[in-house]
């Protein structure tokens, strides 16, 4: 009986330790600053500044974006995703294309694919990749804005 109880305790402790280990293996976590000189925006204005902060949250992560758009207005939006392809609500303002939900899927350890949606309809897609050394994150984004015009961007972020 004591041996069975000990075994159950070891299993429980192992399960609790697995969460932080999974988070440590997520190269997307951290604070990332947009490098405007290495980024390109087509069909949409480049922001004056943008910082992406990614924090572990359960099986996934919470993404928070803050900065200033081309007109000097504040950008501040966030969402939490488990990388399971399910819709996650976006709160705040400044999300590309006016998206109100995102559906994120982890393609591999360094690549996440995101579908941007507005009112349940897909309006864009992005692929976010972290370099092997973990110092650069590149977001390739394409979609259609609220005005019906196509937009594309390659945003390069440096890890802080």
Q: Model-found features: residue ranges?
A:
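Bacterial N-terminal signal peptides that target proteins for export
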Residues: 1-9
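Bacterial N-terminal signal peptides
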Residues: 8-16
């Amino acid at each position: 009986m004591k041996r069975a109880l000990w075994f159950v305790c070891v299993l429980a402790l192992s399960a609790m330790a697995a969460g932080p280990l999974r988070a440590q293996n997520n190269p997307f976590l951290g604070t990332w600053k947009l490098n405007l000189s290495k980024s390109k925006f087509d069909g949409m204005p480049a922001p004056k500044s943008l910082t992406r902060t990614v924090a572990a949250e359960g099986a996934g992560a919470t993404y928070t974006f803050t900065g200033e758009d081309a007109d000097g207005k504040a950008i501040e939006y966030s969402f939490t995703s488990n990388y399971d392809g399910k819709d996650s609500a976006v709160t705040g303002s400044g999300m590309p294309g006016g998206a109100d939900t995102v559906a994120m899927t982890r393609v591999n350890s360094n690549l996440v694919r995101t579908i941007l949606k507005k009112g349940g309809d897909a309006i864009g897609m992005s692929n976010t990749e972290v370099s092997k050394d973990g110092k650069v994150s590149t977001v390739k984004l394409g979609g259609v804005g609220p005005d019906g015009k196509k937009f594309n961007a390659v945003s390069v972020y440096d890890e802080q």
